[in-house]
Design a protein with these regions (language model features):
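Active-site/acyl-donor-binding loops of N-acyltransferases
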Residues: 2-5, 13-17, 27, 67-68, ...
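A conserved beta-strand-loop-helix scaffold within acyl/acetyltransferase catalytic domains
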Residues: 6-75, 118-126, 132-266
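A gly/proline- and charged-residue-enriched helix-loop-helix capping module
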Residues: 85-137
Length: 353
């Protein structure tokens, strides 16, 4: 039998949180989005958080950090487990016990559903097998994901020269061109966050995507930096032209936020900033670097269509592909449904966006 502990409610940073973060960092499928500081960040912007976990012989063996908020015009209370739960999916008893804990947490919050998005790549198990596994444990497979299901992951274990060698020739050229054209890169501080926010606003308007409020980027930086996040700015003659905010958890780094100016684009500042972030992640000991989101299409379609498509994540695919990583996709999302009517309302509302 699995020895279980189940905790409801929120708590200040404590020994239990440190233990949880160590578990997430060491877990092969652990993610930044399951860390205590990610819960702290989201709790400042409309979410409430709750964690459930299991122990065997006094040791954490599984758990989930759940985010809750009202969605669909406030009609539906949603529970969301980003990049989780963290559990041994081959251990049916452990999975069932953990889902029972998740269900209890959801009931206590009045949630009509909980969406899970484990960070497990399709290379590990095909979609049909995975859907059958979801259903076996009472989950409804869902095409609706909150995090981008497809991404590009770089292997940071080789030497820097080999990492460069795996990039597209044009990307290597642009990294070197930035230096030749006088672009300098430095690690930013909290004082640089207003400049980074301005770049984010410019990028959002140019590329037609939503950006967070400036307070969000400040909170993210203050919670994670300097140990688990860094801000890199590419400048020309003292003017910030591009920025990258990179995060790390355990042996994985993630490129969550990036921005660039409309000025001096021929100097390739975005390439310089990205390379600095990759080098930081490698120096920190990360084995992988997640470029965090590309269009959800198979690689042959990505390669055939990226030059013509200019909507959604297509414009950034051209940039991200150049850094030479592997295109991977998660097994997708699934929903724990407690109220079928509310689940239909949520699904219909999501389909309108």
């Amino acid at each position: 039998m699995v020895a279980n502990m189940f905790e409801l409610g929120e708590q200040p940073y404590s020994e239990a949180d440190a233990e949880w973060d160590a578990f997430v960092a060491a877990h092969p499928r652990g993610s930044l989005l399951q860390t205590t500081n990610w819960a702290r960040l989201k709790s400042r912007f409309g979410w409430s958080t709750q964690r459930v976990w299991m122990r065997r012989d006094g040791r954490l063996v599984g758990g989930a950090q759940i985010l809750f908020r009202s969605v669909a015009l406030g009609i539906v209370k949603l529970g969301y487990v980003p990049h989780g739960p963290l559990v041994d999916w081959d251990d049916a008893e452990q999975v069932d016990v953990l889902f029972n804990h998740i269900d209890q947490a959801a009931y206590s919050r009045g949630a009509g559903m909980v969406k899970i998005e484990p960070r497990i790549w399709r290379q590990e198990m095909g979609p049909e097998e995975w859907e059958a596994l979801y259903r076996r444990h009472g989950c409804v497979p869902s095409p609706d994901t909150i995090q981008p299901p497809r991404t590009i992951v770089l292997d940071l274990r080789p030497a820097e020269d080999e990492i460069l060698g795996r990039m597209k020739q044009k990307t290597r050229y642009n990294i070197r061109l930035a230096e030749k054209k006088g672009v300098t890169v430095r690690q930013g501080t909290a004082a640089d966050l207003p400049a980074f926010n301005r770049l984010m606003l410019i990028t959002g308007q140019r590329d037609n995507f939503g950006v967070h409020d400036s307070n969000y980027y400040r909170a993210a930086y203050e919670l994670f930096a300097p140990q688990n996040a860094a801000l890199w700015l590419a400048e020309y003659e003292g003017r910030p032209l591009a920025g990258v905010m990179v995060f790390a958890s355990g042996h994985s780094a993630a490129y969550l936020y990036g921005a660039s100016s409309d000025e001096e684009r021929q100097r390739m500042p975005a390439y310089a900033a990205q390379w600095a972030a990759i080098r930081w992640a490698k120096a920190r000991g990360c084995a992988t670097y997640d470029m965090w989101g590309v269009p959800d299409a198979e690689e042959p379609e990505l390669e055939a269509a990226f030059t013509d498509n200019q909507h959604g994540l297509w414009p950034v695919y051209r940039f991200k592909r150049g850094f030479g990583g592997e295109v991977v996709r998660t097994v997708g999302a699934a929903d724990r449904v407690y109220n079928k009517l509310l689940h239909r309302i949520y699904t219909r509302r999501r389909g309108q966006h």
